[in-house]
From Swiss-Prot:
The gene is RRP36. Belongs to the RRP36 family. Residues 102-129, 319-333 have a biased composition (Basic and acidic residues). It comes from Coccidioides posadasii (strain C735). Component of the 90S pre-ribosome involved in the maturation of rRNAs. Required for early cleavages of the pre-RNAs in the 40S ribosomal subunit maturation pathway. It is found in: Nucleus, Nucleolus. GO terms for cellular component: 90S preribosome; nucleolus. This is rRNA biogenesis protein RRP36.
Length: 333
């Protein structure tokens, strides 16, 4: 057979000098052997349909395989290198042919897949540009940032001033506030011949509604009578609380009235001194001086026993206040 003849042939490769004729002979012999092998395989497939032919081929293939293995063991490394080089050349030529085919396809015209790829690429570029613009705008908005909440606010000088002007702040006005015209300064000053002598609106209202003090005193006396007649302890406690609240209000009102009288008396005295030419500038009383003057006037109006009780009570009150303000170590020591 041709395959056995080609395999049994002894080939000796020259190391120093490569002969192209031997290389061509080797490649042709290998091609012939491969063709023969393919023909033999096709014959074996065709003969596989018959049972007797298969048995004969199987019996004859066993010694042939052993002969092929023995002949392959005797092939030199130079022949194997030349065969490998020939296979590499054939693969490179096939790659070149494939590249030429692709180039010719491109020269023929653009395919629909290329159009789709181009559209996808364009949409991606547009999306990247839009995201970049949004990030830059966000960065610009975040530029005036304070280091802490106590730091002053930073604002660009290019900020345009609004043309609108807030005349009335709607947020400050929670709702329409009720106004009583009886206590309005305009109403109280209207119809009087000398508003300056009358004083402010509060003084005028106190003068016009002074009868309320009489009503308050009458109500306090009636509550004291009810407390004397009451027998229920809960009712007594409620009446005591009401009487205490009313007496505190009356005492506060009287104290404010005394302070106003002291201030008015001092202003009249200072005005008279300036009119007489004894003083050039008036002297205004401080709040502490006004309280001292009111306390002095109150002690003068009291009796001896009441004055002594009030002084003792005031001393205890001041001592308790000083004890509360004193540190714990000094308080216990």
């Amino acid at each position: 057979m041709a395959l056995l003849d080609s395999l049994n042939r002894r080939i000796k490769a020259r190391v120093d000098d490569d002969d192209p004729e031997e290389y061509s002979d080797l490649s042709s012999s290998e091609q012939d052997g491969s063709d023969a092998d393919s023909d033999e395989l096709e014959g074996s497939e065709a003969a596989s349909d018959g049972g007797s032919d298969d048995e004969e081929l199987s019996d004859s293939s066993a010694p042939e395989d052993t002969a092929i293995d023995a002949s392959l063991n005797q092939i030199s490394f130079g022949a194997l290198a030349k065969a490998q080089a020939s296979l590499g050349l054939s693969s490179s030529s096939s790659n070149n042919r494939r590249k030429r085919k692709l180039s010719t396809d491109k020269e023929q015209g653009p395919s629909p897949l290329d159009d789709i790829r181009a559209r996808i690429r364009a949409t991606r570029e547009e999306k990247s540009k839009s995201t970049a613009s949004t990030t830059t705008s966000k960065d610009k908005k975040d530029l005036p940032h304070r280091s802490s909440k106590h730091a002053p606010t930073v604002q660009s000088s290019k900020h345009a001033v609004s043309r609108k002007r807030t005349v009335v702040d709607a947020t400050a006005i929670s709702g329409p506030k009720a106004r009583d015209p009886r206590f309005d300064s305009v109403v109280l000053s209207h119809g009087t011949s000398n508003p300056q002598a009358l004083g402010n609106a509060q003084a005028a209202a106190a003068k016009n509604y002074s009868f309320l003090n009489d009503y308050r005193d009458a109500e306090l006396s009636s509550l004291k009578q009810q407390l004397a007649k009451a027998k229920n302890p809960a009712e007594k406690e409620q009446l005591k609380r009401t009487i205490r609240s009313m007496t505190d209000k009356i005492r506060t009102f009287e104290r404010k009235q005394r302070e106003k009288e002291v201030v008015a008396r001092h202003r009249r005295r200072e005005r008279d001194l300036i009119r007489e030419g004894k003083k050039s500038t008036p002297y205004f009383l401080k709040k502490g001086d006004v309280k001292k003057e009111v306390l002095k006037q109150r002690y003068e109006e009291m009796g001896a026993k009441d004055r002594q009780k009030s002084i003792v009570r005031r001393r205890k009150k001041v001592a308790a206040r000083e004890r509360r303000e004193m540190p714990d170590m000094r308080r216990t020591g």
